[in-house]
Amino acid sequence: MTREIAIGNVKMGGSRPLVLIAGPCVIENETATLRCAERLMTIVNGLSIPLIFKASYDKANRTSVTAFRGPGLKEGLRILAKVKESLGLPVISDIHSIEQVQPAAEVLDILQIPAFLCRQTDLLVEAARTGCVVNVKKGQFLAPWDMENVVGKIVASGNERIILTERGASFGYNNLVSDMRSLPIMRRFGFPVVFDATHSVQLPGGQGGSSGGQREFVEYLSRAAVATGIDGVFLEVHEEPDKALCDGPNSVPLDDLPVLLKKLKAIDAIVK
């Protein structure tokens, strides 16, 4: 069993019910971000599912230099602070450099380490020293057991408020595959484990200048992952994914979310 950690008004891990981490891939603008957060709240309140709101202020590893990256650190954190204060939701976003850590920690409940940066010791240590919860996405290039070394870096820096997230493993060119064995393997380290069901169906760089995705498989993979007894599921959502400025092909339409969450909640209740 994993340890229980508090994230704002949400508790994750141990024998706690499944937690949802959800939101748009990137902050497109303030209005759309707040509207998405409000819709998510309405959905989860009807299902009694704990929610942590996710949106990136900067997508620093987009495929193309011309791709939309977001509003940036200062404006993005202002918008996330507004979501947090107006709706009472814990918030999470990516950090990409040690310079971003302190300002991000003043707003965010969870500092997220992107998969491509999961071995960057200086970034892990700086994030750990804030005392914030640190969510590390397992690199597409890492074996699940290699994440124990990542955990060790954070713990050695005085922080045991850790979440580990599986988001697929590279499988040839422009493709990812989900190995469900990684979930119980990482849970053995004693910290909550989350499955990122939307990035796991991403086709990195699959559209030439941007990534593709296969959102039709999100439900199947998330159901399988929840059946292993994980602590949370991570879903990027959008009102109109085909018009999204980032990761639309693998995002879940908000209109489809209630049905999916009902299924995941039922599976979680059985396995826990």
From Swiss-Prot:
UniProt pathway annotation: Carbohydrate biosynthesis; 3-deoxy-D-manno-octulosonate biosynthesis; 3-deoxy-D-manno-octulosonate from D-ribulose 5-phosphate: step 2/3; Bacterial outer membrane biogenesis; lipopolysaccharide biosynthesis
Chief localization: cytoplasm
Catalytic reaction equation(s): D-arabinose 5-phosphate + phosphoenolpyruvate + H2O = 3-deoxy-alpha-D-manno-2-octulosonate-8-phosphate + phosphate
Domain of life: Bacteria
Protein name: 2-dehydro-3-deoxyphosphooctonate aldolase
Family, per entry: Belongs to the KdsA family.
InterPro entries, per database record: Aldolase_TIM (IPR013785), DAHP1/KDSA (IPR006218), KDO8P_synthase (IPR006269)
Gene Ontology BP terms: keto-3-deoxy-D-manno-octulosonic acid biosynthetic process
Cell compartments where the protein resides: Cytoplasm
UniProt KW Transferase keyword: yes
EC number(s) from the headed UniProt entry: 2.5.1.55
UniProt xrefs under Pfam families: DAHP_synth_1
Keywords, in A-Z order: Cytoplasm, Lipopolysaccharide biosynthesis, Transferase
UniProt gene name: kdsA
GO MF, one annotated term: 3-deoxy-8-phosphooctulonate synthase activity
Gene3D superfamilies per the UniProt record, alphabetical: Aldolase class I
CC annotations in GO: cytoplasm
Keyword Transferase attached: yes
